[in-house]
Amino acid sequence: MARIKVHELRDKSKSDLSTQLKELKAELASLRVAKVTGGAPNKLSKIKVVRKSIAQVLTVSSQKQKSALREAYKNKKLLPLDLRPKKTRAIRRRLTKHQASLKTEREKKKDMYFPIRKYAIKV
């Protein structure tokens, strides 16, 4: 089997990807048998190509699955952990902008009764 182009894989459906994956795994198994029995050198060099093709199919299928999940959870309040943006632990625990901007009653009164003085300079 020749190398697979990823842009062609992205157009395929989930069932097509799974059938292609089964075919590639079967081919890899036969190539490994040929390796043990002392097969031709061109078959041995083909193992790397087939393994890479399997990885590409698995990657595309997982990407499709993740994008479908993103669509499903698009307007929901809570997201699964693996769909949330990856940030540092400290950033994830930081206060939100709204929480940081909140003021206590005392602060509000102080700001109201003692506003910042504004001066105009005559020219």
UniProtKB/Swiss-Prot annotation:
Classification via PROSITE patterns: RIBOSOMAL_L29
CC terms in the record's Gene Ontology section: cytosolic large ribosomal subunit
Gene Ontology BP terms: maturation of LSU-rRNA from tricistronic rRNA transcript (SSU-rRNA, 5.8S rRNA, LSU-rRNA); translation
The keyword Ribonucleoprotein belongs to this UniProt entry's keyword annotation: yes
Keywords: Ribonucleoprotein, Ribosomal protein
Entry GO MF terms: structural constituent of ribosome
Entries under CDD domains matching the protein: Ribosomal_L29_HIP (cd00427)
Annotated InterPro entries: Ribosomal_uL29 (IPR001854), Ribosomal_uL29_CS (IPR018254), Ribosomal_uL29_euk (IPR045059), Ribosomal_uL29_sf (IPR036049)
TM stretches of this protein: none
Keyword Ribonucleoprotein in annotation: yes
Family: Belongs to the universal ribosomal protein uL29 family.
Protein name per its UniProtKB record: Large ribosomal subunit protein uL29x
Source species of the chain: Arabidopsis thaliana (Mouse-ear cress)
The encoding gene: RPL35C
